[in-house]
Amino acid sequence: MPSAWAQTPPPASPPAAAPAPPPAWNVNAPGFPSTEVPLDVTEGTWMSVDVSPKGDELVFDLLGDLYTLPIAGGEAKALTTGAAWDMQPRYSPDGASIAFTSDRGGGDNLWIMKRDGSDSRPVTQESFRLLNSPTWSPDSQYLVARKHFSSRRSLGAGEMWLYHRAGGEGVQLTERPNDQKDAGEPAFSPDGRFLYFSQDTTPGKVFEYNKDPNGQIYVIQRLNLETKELEPFITGPGGSVRPTPSPDGKSLAFVRRVRGKSVLFSADLVSGAERPLFDGLDRDMQETWAIHGVYPAMAWTPDSKSLVFWAQGKLNRIDVASKRVTPIPFHVKGTRTLFARVHSPQAQAVVPERFPVKMLRWVQVSPKGDRVVYQALGHLYTRELPDGLPRRLTKQTEHFEMHPSFSRDGKSIVYTTWDDDKLGTVRVVSAGGGEGKVVSAQPGFYLEPAFSPDGRSIVYRASGGGYLLPGLYSRDPGLYVVGKDGGTPRRLSKDGEQPHFGAGSDRVYFLAVEGGEKEDKRELRSIGLDGTAPRTHLTSAEVSTYRVSPDERWVAFQEVFNAYVAPLSRGGKTVVASKDSKALPVTRVSRDAGNFLHWSGDSKRLYWALGPELFSRELKEAFSFVEGAPEKLPEPPQKGLEIGFLEKADVPTGT
């Protein structure tokens, strides 16, 4: 054995210490400049209130903090403070704990603390399907709350979920019938057999604002927790919300709209009789999305003779038998944290003489890469690349210009126009500028025109009017083809978007969208120029744009704003197009977003735009297997070529 191999090696250097993880973000101490402002009030807005099991104390929320108060009124004592938003407090039936909703963990979740405000801890730790409106089971061991589910619209719908007070992922109790009609405000019956909640039961699956509250928007549902039977329990004109069972199990308080007023009612659970108690409530939220409840939570006193509720800025107690209302005075004195507004340190001119044009639309580079065209301020502009000056493509001022696209030889540009009175046209103009020639046969709603590779045909999309637009010339929407010099157009497909050509002039690629309740099916399809032989090539739920390269070897697509490129497969089954696809190699080419995807004439470079910047990337910079690719592929470009311009501001004169 060589002696050098037998030597004792020197001690290895200790591994470098891993960098310390950044501290968790604290809602109550976010690190922003803040100030404390005094708070001294005897009224509040949208306050949920609960009565302690012994009936001697109230707990309520006000401006994101929780307070206790003697039931007769007086000075309120803060249980929680800070920037976190705490709300909807509920005493446990054993009187030892308070459950509440808080965003102190970053989003609305269920929390528990001792009755004196100490030892607060989260019961749930959802980061997306957030929770609110906790209600205790009679044994004080479980909570039921509204869990939030969103889909295609922003606010979504609720389900009732059961959680042990120690935590866990929860048990689903109800299933939302769709993703837009809400449900919430859960409440246990005192024996624990039933769960009441309010639900929007208006017809259809689509939420609509401005529904008629004099009809029936919400009903109170009752879920039998033993048999799982669900039944509409309180129904009728004016709707029914905020179910609140009495401790003796004989009554159910709720809120109903009576003409223009929100009215407190009580229902006898034996006879079914419903009796109005008080018509001075604040307006409930039946006509809108009410993910935190249609009316603030209220509570019975332990003897089931009185209700405590919020209305007109005050806490009130009503004797159910006599309907006599007694205010419960409260005084909250403390502070609130205000954070400094975000603003630019530099003064901004309100009306500058000139302003930068940043909103460039339908940016398209010529096939040779020597010129770019785009729409700005309602008209088309061209600019020589890389450093030319933008100039108007036409000189007309009678209509707006949109959707420009170069011919494959770069000599012509096809585009669409719009006029509020005369509607729209498809036109062709020299890439050097001039007067556009109309090639469409009649006025209409035209979008996304494109030349065939041989320059003889133009495909475009015709849509329809209605709603805010006139309904004329709207009977036959779809994809059309017309000769470059005009003539009678021919419909290729009754639907489709973004028509364009690949290598040949005999086949048109387009995006086909089939709407679904939860997600769309968004397919790359093609059809012969004679309207026959339809094919489906790619499918996705998220892709908003497909663009086939001129040689038909590649496809670019936009998914969740960013741009991606993949080889375009031939034959076989329809391939799923996705940034996470495993069927074919996929590369992200944009860093922030990739709008208006299009290819160079030789299919070696992809272009896109973001605001006033033009970006591009060669395929050899995106895939290591492309000829000429560097050993290490570059990251997506951070900065593009500025192609916008300064425009004189339209400054008003006079007084």
Residue ranges of model-derived segments:
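Signature of short aromatic-glycine-proline-rich micro-motifs recurring in repeat-based ectodomains
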Residues: T45-S48, P186, W289-D303, Q346-Q364, ...
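Conserved beta-strand position repeated across blades of beta-propeller domains
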Residues: D50, R90, T135, A187, ...
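Loop/turn segments within WD40 beta-propeller blades
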Residues: V51-K54, T301-D303, S366-K368, S549-D551, ...
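Boundary at the C-terminal end of the N-terminal hydrophobic targeting segment
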Residues: A4-A6
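A short helix->beta-strand "capping" segment at the edge of beta-propeller domains
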Residues: P22-W46, A76, A340-K358, S581-V589, ...
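A flexible loop/linker signature enriched in serine peptidases of the S9 family
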Residues: T42, D61-Y67, G82-D86, P93, ...
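N-terminal, post-signal-peptide region of Sec/Tat-exported proteins
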Residues: M47-T81, D86-M87
